[in-house]
Amino acid sequence: MNHHLEETKLLRQEPGGRHYNCAQSLLVPFAAEIGMEKEAADALGAFFGAGMMHGSACGTLTAALMILGKAGKDKETAKKLVDDFLAAHGTTDCRCLLAATEEKGVTRKENCDGLVFDMCQKLATLLTETK
């Protein structure tokens, strides 16, 4: 398991009762790679969870795009990430992702954790590629 995923899993366990939203759970572990302090990355992601607080674009995806942009990745890499997410989940909209989760009988936490952990692994791979 990569160190990003280990830290992401720790944050999603809500250490000390502190909730890290989906965006923060990616931005904080990747802070060093994008030239940020963890505290700044935490603050940056504060209002991107729960689809920017109103069920819009998935915070996991928006955080991943911020990370790719700050890491200097190209538009094609970002577009492919969005397209792959859309193909896998049928939507990029938090509200729709959560509705589909409820229909399957999966808890919101289980669903969001899965999205965050999967994206963490994808980001770790993308950030090590030379493109």
Per-region residue spans from a language model:
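Polybasic, low-complexity association/targeting segments
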Residues: M1-P15
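C-terminal binding/interaction regions
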Residues: N2, E76-K131
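Conserved active-site and cofactor/substrate-binding residues in soluble primary-metabolism enzymes
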Residues: N21, S25, E39, A43, ...
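Amphipathic alpha-helical segments within well-ordered protein domains
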Residues: L27-A31, G45, G49, L65-M66, ...
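Acidic-glycine-rich active-site phosphate/pyrophosphate-binding loop
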Residues: L27-G45, A88-L97
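Short glycine/serine- and small hydrophobic-enriched flexible loop segments
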Residues: V28-A32, M66-G72, Q121-T125
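Acidic, glycine-rich active-site loops and adjacent beta-strand->loop/helix elements
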Residues: G45-M52, A71, V82, A87, ...
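Glycine/serine-rich anion-binding loops at beta->alpha junctions
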Residues: F48-K70
